[in-house]
Amino acid sequence: MNFSSELLNKGNKTPAFSISIEGRDITTVLDNRLMGLTLTDNRGFEADQLDLELDDADGKIVLPRRGAVITLALGWKGQPLFPKGAFTVDEIEHTGAPDRLTIRARSADFRETLNTRREKSWHKTTVGEVVKEIAARHKLKMALGKDLSDKPVEHIDQTNESDGSFLMRLARQYGAIASVKNGNLLFIRQGQGKSATGKPLPVITITRKDGDSHRFTLADRGAYTGVIASWLHTREPAKKESTTVKRKRRTKKQKKEPEAKQGDYLVGTDENVLVLNRTYANRSNAERAAKMQWERLQRGVASFSLQLAEGRADFYTEMPVKVSGFKQPIDDAEWTITTLTHTVSPDNGFTTSLELEVRIDDFEME
């Protein structure tokens, strides 16, 4: 990567990436056009998302076809890059002037088959056999926690329910998570520190000097009746031209209402709400944050967010983390990464933000 901005160099390190589309390496083509790259790595069946913002002032960029597959590797110049998976182009937007192209892609599309409703009953079997059958049906490799494989399943029905929904329900019953990452069906206990192939992950240590900012939240699960998150579009330049193309869906298309430039999203009821301090860039992000915090409150977990000054492409969701330099109860807790956001931009270089959680039952506060 050869950004012209010296602001990208942090401690004599320069961000680097490798991008291919439909098997063709376009890293060099994008080298001087990249205005921003954001990769969000989510836990569970929520699709990972890749956003690319490119300079098209000369009008020479060819629009990618809908459904094209993008592969990404990310890291630092002079060091091995870390593969971050394959993503299907879901939405493209061209705006101007000045002309720029935004490409939005989501983790390669396993969702159509996993979202097909089925009728199935299992009787006198094990968790391992159930997960194995579903993995085989979708041509996925299986990464199953050994402590879950032999758990007995006396009887369970899948009634007019998709495999994705059924796996999530089964995972909740056994205190596990279900996810698809890079062609692997992952079914493991939360916070067990397993990779997508089921191998143990080393505990990552993060010190306070590694971060630009942090936020810790601990609340009584019964104290709040809802969560509110606010959004405000902060990047709304005047548009002379705007073209948006979305992938065709099998479901009936409905007219999309224009999104308000600002607002609040409430999950739960408004008798006694927890208001998130952060203002999000759009309604979708605010909705996701509110729902995530509400689920945390219902599960009874403490949450901790960190903005790292230097990006860590080697981090993945479900990695176990130890932190130091904060309050003692925070340092003593065993954290797990639930969401990762990698960002590359001319202004801030390569940074990584982490969302971590720990069960309140495992958290002691004097």
Regions found by a protein language model. Name each.
Residues A86-T95, K120, Q192-K194, E334-P346:
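Short, compositionally biased
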Residues Q49-E53, A105, E119-A143, Q158-K181, ...:
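Amphipathic, non-transmembrane alpha-helical segments in extracytoplasmic/periplasmic proteins
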Residues M1-E112:
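Assembly/oligomerization scaffold segments
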Residues R33, L37-R65, G211-E366:
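An acidic/polar, Gly/Ser/Thr-rich interaction patch typically located in mid-to-C-terminal regions
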